[in-house]
Curated annotation (Swiss-Prot):
Its cofactor is [2Fe-2S] cluster; [4Fe-4S] cluster. One of its GO terms (cellular component) is mitochondrial intermembrane space. It holds the Pfam family CIAPIN1. GO terms for molecular function: 2 iron, 2 sulfur cluster binding; 4 iron, 4 sulfur cluster binding; electron transfer activity; metal ion binding. This is Anamorsin-B. [4Fe-4S] cluster binds at C275, C278, C286, C289. Residues 236-252 are annotated as: Fe-S binding site A. One of its GO terms (biological process) is apoptotic process. Keywords: 2Fe-2S, 4Fe-4S, Apoptosis, Cytoplasm, Iron, Iron-sulfur, Metal-binding, Mitochondrion, Nucleus. The gene is ciapin1-B. A motif (Cx2C motif 2) lies at residues 286-289. The twin Cx2C motifs are involved in the recognition by the mitochondrial CHCHD4/MIA40-GFER/ERV1 disulfide relay system. The formation of 2 disulfide bonds in the Cx2C motifs through dithiol/disulfide exchange reactions effectively traps the protein in the mitochondrial intermembrane space. Residues 171-223 are annotated as: Linker.
């Protein structure tokens, strides 16, 4: 028991089961009693009556289960949960249980036993040792479970309860407000650079400073207002015999000029009539209209009159 690190003043719950020897159980209890001293306490409990004993929660610093040599009990999930409940936060559980090397319905493997301890709310699950079962424990196990395999071994594991109650809650201080970022420190400016970009009013009257007069940059020709002819490109409407044609992206005004000329030609060549209704058809024509009998036509459309009506009868 020296490897358990049980200290004076600790409260220990010793869980035993059949077919443990009463003499061996008494010796183990007395050994633990000498370790905890008068300020501590050692309580004995049968595994089959653990759930009915109603121990107070978080009472024991240690729970030692099935550590007797002839013990061969299987810890159910309810039993492990009850052991975790009665342990103080930060307390430890040390147990021994027969395991198998292969998957079986009656017995667990060492890995599944570790998972069962973790599911009970315990942490820091560690396998301490593994060894064979005693003949008495093996016989009792085969009788209770019917297991006839040859891969049995006895494993000792330890686990700890977290430093808080399992299922306890605590309010978290969370801040969802927007945090104002701290202004970043601006890099220091080089004094020489800052001086180069600073213009003093006194520098304007310095004789060594040469200021350029903007009016001196323009000559007399630059101040003249250009006429429209000078703005045209040399090849714009080139040639006296060729028809004038504006450029694709004309910006000198030739395109607008040619458009106005074409509109004037169309206006002059459009035929005129006294009544202005000849093109609508016979219903709108005069009795002496030369277009009588002809179909309606569009305004300005060229119409050729037949010369049959001009011959003498």
């Amino acid at each position: 028991m020296a490897d358990l690190d049980v200290k004076a003043g600790d409260k220990v719950l010793l869980v035993w089961s059949q077919p443990s020897s009463p003499t061996t159980l008494k010796e183990l209890a007395e050994s633990l009693g000498s370790m905890v001293g008068s300020e501590g306490r050692v309580s004995l409990e049968n595994m089959e009556r653990l759930l009915m004993s109603s121990h107070a929660a978080s009472t024991y610093d240690w729970v030692l289960s099935s550590l007797l040599p002839d013990s061969s009990s299987i810890h159910t999930s309810e039993t492990l949960a009850e052991m975790a409940r009665v342990i103080k936060p930060g307390g430890k559980l040390v147990l021994e249980e027969p395991v198998t090397g292969t998957n079986d319905q009656q017995l667990r493997t060492a890995e599944k036993l570790m998972s069962a301890l973790k599911l009970s709310g315990l942490v820091s699950v560690t396998e301490i040792s593994k060894g064979p079962l005693t003949p008495k424990a093996l016989s009792a196990l085969r009788t209770s479970t019917g297991f006839q395999g040859n891969t049995l071994s006895r494993v000792r594991m330890s686990a700890s309860k977290p430093n808080f109650e399992v299922g306890s809650s605590s309010q978290l201080k969370l801040s969802f407000g927007k945090k104002t970022p701290k202004p970043e420190d601006k890099p220091a400016l080089d004094p020489n650079v800052e001086k180069a970009w600073t213009l003093s009013a006194n520098d304007m009257d310095d004789d060594d400073v040469d200021l350029v007069d903007s009016d001196a940059l323009l000559d007399a020709d630059d101040l003249k207002k250009p006429d429209a002819a000078s703005l045209k490109a040399p090849s714009c409407g080139d040639g006296t015999t060729k028809k004038k044609k504006a450029c694709k992206n004309c910006s000198c005004g030739l395109a607008e000029e040619l458009e106005q000329e074409s509109k004037g030609v169309q206006t002059i060549s459009q035929p005129k009539s006294a009544c202005g209704s000849c093109y609508l058809g016979d219903a709108f024509r005069c009795a002496s209209c030369p277009y009588l009998g002809m179909p309606a036509f569009k305004p300005g459309e060229k119409v050729v009159l037949a010369n049959t009506g001009l011959n003498d009868a």
